[in-house]
Amino acid sequence: MTQAITVEESRELDDKTINKIGIPSLVLMERAGLKIYENMLDNKDLDLSNVLILAGTGNNGGDGLVVARLLATHGYQVSILTVGNPDHASEDHLAQARICNYYQIPKVFMNADFNKFTTLVDALFGSGLSRNVGGDFATIIDKANASTAKIHAIDIPSGLNGDTGDVMGTAIKAISTSTVAYPKVGMLKDQAKPYTGKIYVDDIGIYRGNAFENE
């Protein structure tokens, strides 16, 4: 079985890769987006004829925006729904949003009919979720699960606890998930399996050694 890591170990690997080794976070985001795009092409259970990216305002959402651009530039029909406070958006998310604006990728809003889309990409939360999902995020997750579209999740299905695999109020039910370097331990728990679907583990250049080695 593929080795799994905790959420804290994942944070430490990210920190070492970006701040000690020196690979820029935006480079990692581009690599992640390309791998996710390739995973989606690989999964023949996904119909990519009309895709909606559900993007939070953090770096998980930024990964989703890279996927949106790659789909658009390869001729796929794709739209973006951004959920969350734009005033709290990460710098890398804002950079990807500007690129999507350049390519004039359509935006939709909370009242969009999800049933008209064939695939939804869950880029709402990463693995660091520590409290129950509420508000607009819970509304979007429940709406996505109730739709006829199939869902591909980025990093971990939004609403799952990365360490325990427990549902934090509500969670995306994906048919496939792209995660980087290692899966989180919670993703391999029995209770998480109905939510993760097929798991793709992608190498994007994250440091894969011992996160706790002596410097």
Curated annotation (Swiss-Prot):
Transmembrane segments: none
Pfam hit, one: YjeF_N
Sequence positions that bind K(+): N60, D122, S158
Segments forming domain YjeF N-terminal: 10-212
Cofactor(s) needed for function: K(+)
Keyword Nucleotide-binding listed: yes
Key words of the record: Isomerase, Metal-binding, NAD, NADP, Nucleotide-binding, Potassium
Molecular functions per Gene Ontology: metal ion binding; NAD(P)HX epimerase activity; nucleotide binding
EC number: 5.1.99.6
Keyword Ribosomal protein tagged: no
Family label: Belongs to the NnrE/AIBP family.
NCBIfam families tied to this protein: yjeF_nterm
Protein name per the record: NAD(P)H-hydrate epimerase
Organism ancestry: Bacteria, Bacillati, Bacillota, Bacilli, Lactobacillales
